[in-house]
């Protein structure tokens, strides 16, 4: 029986590790402050970070706005807690720092104003929800959330 050198043992160990599949990349953390690069006469301009994360998994924390109903498959995530229903207000009262969150499945929503952390796929571009008529520029799809 031939003795195995330390070097051969280390190389064999590293090669065996290389055969394991790599874990899927973790979701990138996004903040409300990083959503937009600028605001001008042409409207909001998405930040380079947002553009780079299009169709990628993200994690973002914020506050669940008062929902339309107690159980739903979507809600609005805001930077700051809202005491009013965003759907019940005029455009003048509509906050700029919001994301629409579409859950992977309908779920009971937490108390309005509760801080939550959302994980899902970032979607960019104008979209009109066929059921609610809600218009959004940024969405998190196939999402889940937990109380922060």
Predicted regions and their residues:
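OB-fold and OB-like single-stranded nucleic-acid-recognition modules
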Residues: 25-148
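N-terminal export signals
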Residues: 2, 8-26
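Short N-terminal signal/transit or membrane-insertion segments
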Residues: 2-3, 54
